A protein has these predicted regions:
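Short linear motifs at secondary-structure transitions and domain/linker junctions
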Residues: 1-9, 60-64, 107
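OB-fold ssDNA-binding interfaces and closely related basic DNA-contact patches used
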Residues: 1-45
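Residue-level marker of intrinsically disordered, low-complexity segments enriched
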Residues: 6, 16, 29, 41, ...
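Intrinsically disordered, low-complexity, compositionally biased regions/tails
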Residues: 20, 41, 45, 50, ...
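Generic structural motif
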Residues: 34-38, 48, 91-93, 106
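Acidic, aromatic-enriched beta-alpha/helix-loop junctions
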Residues: 38-75
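Short, compact, well-ordered microdomains
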Residues: 65-107
Length: 107
């Protein structure tokens, strides 16, 4: 299948903590990704993130999930989003299930 690719020209980083009785004070990062003012996806990182899958398409947006330790690497790729060439991508297996997803930078 052809990969789903969403170009990014702007992003917002949210850093926070999730507190509940079972696992207090778990950190997370959410990066909302936009293209021409419309949200095209999000990247969630952290030990509070427990998705059923690590990449998906939801309501026309690419959603990616990573361990918090990957934040510096992902943020480094996102630097320069306003100058173009940055995109979220998602590849699926022959059954249409997400298999690979990430952030790419073209130069």
């Amino acid at each position: 299948m052809e990969p789903v690719v969403m170009e990014i020209d702007h992003y917002i980083v949210h850093y926070g903590t999730v507190s509940d009785r079972e696992a207090p004070n778990r950190e997370y990062v959410r990066i909302d990704c936009f293209y021409r003012g419309a949200k095209v996806g999000q990247i969630l990182l952290g030990n509070s993130v427990n998705p059923g899958n690590y990449a998906s398409v939801s309501n026309g947006e690419i959603h990616l999930y990573f361990p918090l330790e990957q934040f510096a690497n992902i943020h480094a790729v996102l630097q320069g989003a306003s100058s173009g060439g940055i995109a979220l991508y998602l590849e699926s297996d022959p059954n249409g299930e997400p298999s690979i997803g990430g952030v790419r930078r073209e130069r």
